[in-house]
Amino acid sequence: MVNEYNEISYAKKMLNSGFLTNRRMYELNILAKYFYYIGYKPKEVKTKVIEFCNTHFENFNEAKYFDKIESILANAKKNTIVEVGSIGITDKEIEFIQSLKETNKFNEVLFCLMVIKRIREKLGQQAYLNCKYSKFSKMCGLSSTKAIYPILRRMEELGLIRICRNSNVEILFNVNTTHGKHVLAVNDFDNICAYYRNYTGKSRYIECQSCGKMVRVHGNRQRYCKACAREMNIKKTIERKKV
């Protein structure tokens, strides 16, 4: 999971653990932006990125990746690092969703759009969904991209959204949260619907205590996602062998 909305937190995790996914060049871009953010100069940023690669990138060859590293550094220098933090949701917003008397799937998609709207507003951007429908479908917990189309059409009929010619979605609804009570804090933006499902009791999820990813609970003592649990077990095994 590459957290594109909380890049400062993500970069700090990289410095502690190395690469977190197989999208290494994308992650290096986040790391380079972070180094610029904390005040390093261009030459220092390049040195730090290469040091990181030498430590965490098996068989890394600076000459082989020269062009890619240069491109990453140039891109990072001109783009501001993104840190949304947590998105709080109030009881007024939940009540708005449920007042429409639509299906549970509809409610989950609307909740996801609500969070995305709040993210865009926090970044000073217009309230649009402009990612691929396949990615948005995953945020909504839908098994197929095809399932999103009838829901979006229904939302457009209700005046909640406007589907643009380029398939971007303008989010039109507004909820008055005055005197609203904070009931949810969304941190994992790759699995937004999990928070709504948790709140409504449809499913039970936890945030992995290592990476923050929302994962379905399969036992009362579960604290980590599968990947982090595997990594923790490997570390424990190594520590036991040292004794």
Residues of each region from the PLM?
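Detector for short helical micro-motifs
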Residues: 107-120
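Residues immediately within or flanking Cys/His clusters that coordinate Zn2+
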Residues: 203-205, 222
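Short Cys/His-rich metal-coordination motifs, predominantly Zn2+-binding knuckles/fingers
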Residues: 208-212, 228
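Short metal-binding segments enriched for Cys and/or His
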Residues: 229-243
